[in-house]
């Protein structure tokens, strides 16, 4: 009881001192008295009293902002030294209540929320952790370091992906502009002028900008994998591949380059896929994995690919991806790979044939006539090519896709011919009318 009474007496003395300093608007004195009270409670390991004093001091009339900020910052150092989870959660909630609605401790509130969300996640409460994180809009915090903002938003995205909330994950990911990762960190930062908002330095546990870039694209790969957006997955792996630390070590870039090759083949044929495919083929590192270089060359070359021989050759490599960086290529990857080979073969046939029987087309594609017609129809609907099927005669007619300028020029030319014809007809009619009128005169 003696120690307890001594502690209370010391706290009462410091509270009186704090009151005098606060009323005199002495920032340094108020801050010192408030932090000493918290330190006494911590040294005594009286966590209940610590929470009470934090709330009590923060609610004092005319309490100085600097004193509240110092109290919150000091109490945050005690969080990791709490004896159990319940005490830790109680202290974090107390500090959250104190910092609620106060712009001068918004960064501390964000860090506290992150700590609480981590505890909830460890307890298996993913949804609660995600909801907690989403309450904080760090993108509006002007004084928070850029890397800390990005790390916080990425944590929000990760928790949304963990709870299968892909819509919200996409919304949150759009708060990060990928160009921010390409900023030149080597440039000397300008010293802030007097009166400018000071940006706090990021804590030591926050990753660097390049590390955050990798985390960002790994999360985007998880998001795009949900809808099997192969071209976007490929672009994300390409961004990871371009990180200097990845390119320096073959153990890291070889698995990433393998993934780029696979997803390029899995992606539907379009201008972006074609551009990435040609750019990847020019990469010198591709010679280190010759099988994949040959695979890309097969896809680029306008020749019919035999599915069975291709699958037999690359089946083991396909299965090997499960044990490499990024994991398997997806549940539907095997089916989609076969579909892409069929689409490639149809494009090859359309290049060399103007007219072909459906039976011969099915033979070239190693499919039944019904399957060949189905895949051809799907490609026509997706506007990958232009074709017409004459079902009674069983003939497919391919047409060359015209550029929009060509179509416009053709239409303008036909319209000009039509107007010329109309004008000529008018002249002829007028001529005939004049001739007949002249003949009727006496």
UniProtKB/Swiss-Prot annotation:
SUPFAM superfamilies: Winged helix' DNA-binding domain. InterPro entries: PCI_dom (IPR000717), PSMD12-CSN4-like_N (IPR054559), PSMD12/CSN4 (IPR040134), RPN5_C (IPR040896), WH-like_DNA-bd_sf (IPR036388), WH_DNA-bd_sf (IPR036390). One of its GO terms (cellular component) is nucleus. Residues 6-137 form a coiled coil. Pfam families: PCI, PSMD12-CSN4_N, RPN5_C. Component of the 19S regulatory particle (RP/PA700) lid subcomplex of the 26S proteasome. The 26S proteasome is composed of a core protease (CP), known as the 20S proteasome, capped at one or both ends by the 19S regulatory particle (RP/PA700). The RP/PA700 complex is composed of at least 17 different subunits in two subcomplexes, the base and the lid, which form the portions proximal and distal to the 20S proteolytic core, respectively. This is 26S proteasome non-ATPase regulatory subunit 12 homolog A.
């Amino acid at each position: 009881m003696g120690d307890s009474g001594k502690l209370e007496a010391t706290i009462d003395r410091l509270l009186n001192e704090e009151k005098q300093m606060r009323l005199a608007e002495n920032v340094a004195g108020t801050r010192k008295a408030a932090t000493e009270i918290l330190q006494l409670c911590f040294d005594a390991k009286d966590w209940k009293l610590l929470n009470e004093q934090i709330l009590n001091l923060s609610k004092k009339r005319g309490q100085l902002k600097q004193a509240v900020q110092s109290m919150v910052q000091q109490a945050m150092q005690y969080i990791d030294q709490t004896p159990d989870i319940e005490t830790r959660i109680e202290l974090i909630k107390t500090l959250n209540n104190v910092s609620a609605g106060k712009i001068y401790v918004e960064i501390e509130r964000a860090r506290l929320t992150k700590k609480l969300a981590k505890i909830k996640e460890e307890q298996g409460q993913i949804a609660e952790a995600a909801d907690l994180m989403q309450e904080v809009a760090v993108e509006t915090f002007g004084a928070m370091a850029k890397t800390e903002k990005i790390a916080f938003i990425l944590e929000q995205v990760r928790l949304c992906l963990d709870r299968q909330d892909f819509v919200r994950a996409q919304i949150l990911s759009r708060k990060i502009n990928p160009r921010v990762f390409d900023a030149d960190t080597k440039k000397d930062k300008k010293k802030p002028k007097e009166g400018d908002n000071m940006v706090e330095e990021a804590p030591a546990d926050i990753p660097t900008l390049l590390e955050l870039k990798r985390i960002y694209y790994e999360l985007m790969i998880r998001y795009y994998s949900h809808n099997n957006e192969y071209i976007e997955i490929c672009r994300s792996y390409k961004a990871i591949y371009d990180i200097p630390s990845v390119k320096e070590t073959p153990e890291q870039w070889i698995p990433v380059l393998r993934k780029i090759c696979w997803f390029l083949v899995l992606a539907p044929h379009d201008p972006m896929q074609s551009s990435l495919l040609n750019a990847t083929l020019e990469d010198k590192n591709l010679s280190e994995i010759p099988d994949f270089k040959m695979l890309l060359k097969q896809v680029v070359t306008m020749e019919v690919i035999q599915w069975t021989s291709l699958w037999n050759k690359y089946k083991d490599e396909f299965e090997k991806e499960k044990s490499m960086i990024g994991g398997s290529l997806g549940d539907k990857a095997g089916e989609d790979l076969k579909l892409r080979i069929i689409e490639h073969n149809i494009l090859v046939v359309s290049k060399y044939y103007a007219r072909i029987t459906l039976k011969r087309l099915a033979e070239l594609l190693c499919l039944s006539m019904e399957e060949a017609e189905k895949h051809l129809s799907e490609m026509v609907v997706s506007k990958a090519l232009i074709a017409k099927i004459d079902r009674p005669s069983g003939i497919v007619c391919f047409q060359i896709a015209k550029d929009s300028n060509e179509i416009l020029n053709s239409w303008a030319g036909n319209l000009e011919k039509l107007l010329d014809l109309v004008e000529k007809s008018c002249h002829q009619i007028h001529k005939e009318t004049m001739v007949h009128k002249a003949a009727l005169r006496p």
